[in-house]
């Protein structure tokens, strides 16, 4: 089992020449490779895409075997991938998914980091995060609009919709956290973000997600103060330990205007630098002394949450951004760790009730002009949504593509399938140079059960019911998605979530029209269904408006 290979540099093919037998198998092949592009992945030579140890394949032998299988797969065959390893090719039919993926799933009693790590070290499992092991990661852009929407809503609720002259404090510049500084600036706020790895800071600078950096807190605060005074949003990366910096801010009596965190706290061994440790010591002991690392990280997380709770008590709008930091602190003895809310119940759930979530697409041509054309098509088909148009304009101006050109765009039930059909028609007519793939994050309205994040504080108490993502995966399979994935532990770690993903290819064919219409209607409809079942009036109204047939829910 080879998990580190310094000789490997993987990039997706572009253009219209196929390596596989059809676009329906070329697409997952390119997206797998795109996940490991050095401009996309956090640690590509270790197959790590983002989120601690979120991998695209179990090991390099499995990666090679997946590539070989996709290259030879026929139009009526389906490849099964078990925790990053290809385990079977079976005869199905042309409208069935070409790939079915299950990553990190464990029987609930054994669904914890200790047991998973035993399996992982034996080469029997792989942590797929959400979009790492499901081959639809698009770099930090994948979360930037959701983060932007959250920050905008924080501004609406706490500062009358105006974040000019305000600043956000946060931690983490990894694959997910790296979206925070750009999202904050887009929302009108300055951002001070602490990151312990210089390489992560450098990547965000290189890709345009971060404006500047320093290793001096005094300098960082000076830059933030100047930007707020001038009301010119600026993002500043600070090299350091976020828990240490929060303690220092409290000592100095300095309060941010908004507070959150996106370190990889969900993984106490691989995702969080203990206070007082160097990165080099941490990296060495993550292999040689895992229990020591975990204990030290949990103690630091408890300190981190204590500081956040203090700021919360001082009136600073404080929110958990879904990395399970509160849970880790609770287990470390901080009984009131959940005194401040998660971002979904606080700011995002009304969108989920209407099936609105992180719709994304990728141009397999590799040509940014294809994304420009699809951006224009979105504006044409959704002409009256000024907020969406503003987002697309900002994205075109400010977001640098990582790997294959892509776009993220939060739209919901009734719009997703219209956009998919329009994109497919653009491929058919030749307006787009090659097919596009449409997917989403597993963080969506109907595809995840995560009591400390997406399904926190559900109205009916159904936070932990995970039938919903299973039904979502089954329905997307039956509807004809090109590949479907079912994962465990993404975002918040082992034992705390189950979630499903789907991707569908717009290859320009009439057969694709039928699959697109089914998948891109049914997928967001499951989110409306799930929230209607929980008793949300917004969701029941949406279900009635869209004519959903929900016999046990709408009576």
Curated annotation (Swiss-Prot):
Leading EC class: lyase
Main location: cytoplasm
Requisite cofactors: NAD(+)
GO biological process, one term: L-histidine catabolic process to glutamate and formamide
Task of the protein: Catalyzes the conversion of urocanate to 4-imidazolone-5-propionate.
Family to which the UniProt record says this protein belongs: Belongs to the urocanase family.
Protein's recorded name: Urocanate hydratase
Annotated source species: Xanthomonas euvesicatoria pv. vesicatoria (strain 85-10)
TM stretches of this protein: none
Pathway stated in the Swiss-Prot or TrEMBL entry: Amino-acid degradation; L-histidine degradation into L-glutamate; N-formimidoyl-L-glutamate from L-histidine: step 2/3
Keyword Lyase in annotation: yes
Name of the gene: hutU
Catalytic activity: 4-imidazolone-5-propanoate = trans-urocanate + H2O
Subcellular location: Cytoplasm
EC number: 4.2.1.49
Key word DNA-binding present: no
PANTHER family membership: UROCANATE HYDRATASE
Gene Ontology CC: cytoplasm
Record-linked NCBIfam families: hutU, PRK05414.1
Keywords: Cytoplasm, Histidine metabolism, Lyase, NAD
Residues binding NAD(+): 51-52, 129, 175-177, 195, 262-266, 272-273, 321, 491
Record note on cofactor: Binds 1 NAD(+) per subunit.
GO molecular function annotation: urocanate hydratase activity
Disulfide-linked positions: none
Pfam family, one: Urocanase_C
Catalytic residues of the enzyme: 409
């Amino acid at each position: 089992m080879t998990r580190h290979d310094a000789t490997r540099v993987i990039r997706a093919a572009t253009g219209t020449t196929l390596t596989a037998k059809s676009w329906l198998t070329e697409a997952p092949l390119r997206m797998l490779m795109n996940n490991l592009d050095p401009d996309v992945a956090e640690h590509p030579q270790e197959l790590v895409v983002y989120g601690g140890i979120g991998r695209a394949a179990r090991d390099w032998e499995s990666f090679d075997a997946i590539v070989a299988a996709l290259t030879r797969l026929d139009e009526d065959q389906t490849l099964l991938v078990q925790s990053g390893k290809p385990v079977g090719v079976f005869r199905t039919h042309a409208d069935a998914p070409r790939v079915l993926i299950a990553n990190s799933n464990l029987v609930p009693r054994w669904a914890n980091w200790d047991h998973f790590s035993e399996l992982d070290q034996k080469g029997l499992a792989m942590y797929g995060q959400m979009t790492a092991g499901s081959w639809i990661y698009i770099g930090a852009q994948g979360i930037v609009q959701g983060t932007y929407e959250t920050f905008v809503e924080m501004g609406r609720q706490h500062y009358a919709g105006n974040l000019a002259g305000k600043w956000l404090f946060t931690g983490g510049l990894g694959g997910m956290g790296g979206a925070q500084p750009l999202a904050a600036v887009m929302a009108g706020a300055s951002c001070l973000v602490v990151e312990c790895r210089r390489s992560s800071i450098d990547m965000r600078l290189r890709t345009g997600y971060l404006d500047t950096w320093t290793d001096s807190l005094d300098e960082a605060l000076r830059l933030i103060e100047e930007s707020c005074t001038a009301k010119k949003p600026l993002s500043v990366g600070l090299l350091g330990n976020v828990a240490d910096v929060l303690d220092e801010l409290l000592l100095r009596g300095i309060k941010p205007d908004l507070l959150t965190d996106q370190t990889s706290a969900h993984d106490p061994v691989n995702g969080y630098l203990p206070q007082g440790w160097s990165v080099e010591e941490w990296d060495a002991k993550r292999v040689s002394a895992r229990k020591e690392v975990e204990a030290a990280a949990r103690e630091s997380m408890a300190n981190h949450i204590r500081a956040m709770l203090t700021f919360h008590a001082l009136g600073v709008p404080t929110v958990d951004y879904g990395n399970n930091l509160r849970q880790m602190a609770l287990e470390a003895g901080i009984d009131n760790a959940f005194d401040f809310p998660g971002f979904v119940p606080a700011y995002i759930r009304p969108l989920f009730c209407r099936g609105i979530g992180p719709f994304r697409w990728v141009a397999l041509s590799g040509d940014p002009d294809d994304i420009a054309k699809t951006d224009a098509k979105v504006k044409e088909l959704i002409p009256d949504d000024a907020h969406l148009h503003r987002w697309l304009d900002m994205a075109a101006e400010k977001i640098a593509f990582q790997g294959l050109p892509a776009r993220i765009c939060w739209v919901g039930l009734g719009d997703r399938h219209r956009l998919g059909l329009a994109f497919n028609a653009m491929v058919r007519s030749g307006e787009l140079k090659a097919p596009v793939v449409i997917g989403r994050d597993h963080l969506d309205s109907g595809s995840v059960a995560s009591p400390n994040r997406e399904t926190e504080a559900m109205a009916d108490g159904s936070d932990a019911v995970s039938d919903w993502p299973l039904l979502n995966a089954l329905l997307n399979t039956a509807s004809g998605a090109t590949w479907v994935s079912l994962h465990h532990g993404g975002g918040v770690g082992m034992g705390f979530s189950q979630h499903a993903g789907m991707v569908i290819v717009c290859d320009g064919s009439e057969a694709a029209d039928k699959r697109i219409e089914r998948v891109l209607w049914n997928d967001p409809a499951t989110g409306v269904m799930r929230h209607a079942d929980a008793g949300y009036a917004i969701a029941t109204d949406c279900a009635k408006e869209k004519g959903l047939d929900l016999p046990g829910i709408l009576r």
